[in-house]
A protein has these predicted regions:
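N-terminal, positively charged/glycine-rich alpha-helical extensions of SAM-dependent methyltransferases
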Residues: 1-18
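Conserved alpha-helix/loop element of class I SAM-dependent methyltransferases that forms part
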Residues: 25-44
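Class I SAM-dependent methyltransferase SAM/SAH-binding core
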Residues: 49, 56-107
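A short acidic, Gly/Pro-enriched loop at the edge of an enzyme's catalytic core
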Residues: 110-117
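A short SAM/SAH-binding and catalytic strip from SAM-dependent methyltransferases
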Residues: 117-129
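A short, conserved alpha-helix within the catalytic core of class I
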Residues: 127-137
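Conserved beta-strand signature within the Rossmann-like core of class I S-adenosyl-L-methionine
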Residues: 145-151
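C-terminal alpha-helical "lid/dimerization" subdomain adjacent to the S-adenosyl-L-methionine
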Residues: 152-200, 206-208
Length: 223
């Protein structure tokens, strides 16, 4: 099935609210399990970068799991970051270790060779030019940094996409059902992501299908 791009940002208030209120506990928990499989240790003193942080659920999970780490969290949507700020304000102990950044990729607010860990969940499919994500990874990561990028995976047919929408968003508001459907059409296949890594000159990362609708790019960059 051919890729269909979708808007890069969720800027509408109703979109951001529906996304924030949706139950993404299953994929977000999967993301943290995959991170643990990378055996990052305690991450004491480590600084992570979360690209496309949305309402910051993964940021909160990360900071809770790794209490000695810090995280910079970037998103281009002011509406999403407003929900992220509200979530962090409810957890002041975690908020002290997080900096929210509103910007698009490429971002001149992100320092080079600065981060021990690069995280991203559900950003890649939003990007019309996916190379910008991999350029940001190589620019921002320290040598030997850990990388975990998880995203939706484009299904082979429109019927398959509709079945996934029915399975995982059957009771969701229509705005969220439409966003999920559009995101499935906009997502990449594993072989396309592999080609992106080759184009970016990134070695050492593994691509894996990690659910019936997600793929992950993970591993450690060369030192």
């Amino acid at each position: 099935m051919k890729r269909r791009v979708e808007p890069e940002l969720m800027e509408e208030a109703d979109q951001a609210l529906a996304y924030t209120q949706a139950d993404f506990s299953e994929p977000n928990a999967l993301f943290l399990r995959l991170l643990k499989e990378l055996e990052p240790g305690s991450l004491a003193g480590a600084r992570a970068l979360d690209l496309g942080c949305g309402p910051a659920d993964i940021v909160l999970r990360f900071l809770t799991t790794y209490p000695l780490a810090q995280c910079d969290a970037l998103d281009g949507s002011a509406a999403m970051l407003a929900h992220a700020r509200e979530a962090l304000d409810r957890r002041p102990g975690l908020a002290r270790r997080c900096q929210l950044i509103q910007d698009l990729l490429p971002s001149d607010q992100l320092p080079g060779a600065h981060y021990d860990l690069i995280l991203s969940n559900s950003l890649l499919h939003h990007l019309h030019e996916p190379d910008v994500l991999w350029q940001t990874v190589t620019h921002c990561a320290k040598p030997g940094a850990l990388v975990l990028i998880m995203d939706l995976m484009r299904p082979p047919s429109a019927g398959w996409a509709e079945a996934l929408v029915s399975t995982y968003a059957d009771d969701a508001p229509e705005v969220l059902r439409n966003d999920f459907r559009n995101s499935l059409f906009a997502a990449f296949e594993p072989n396309e992501v592999a080609a992106q890594l080759v184009q970016a000159g990134i070695d050492g990362l593994e691509i894996a299908v990690v659910s019936d609708r997600h793929l992950a790019v993970w591993g450690r960059l060369a030192s």
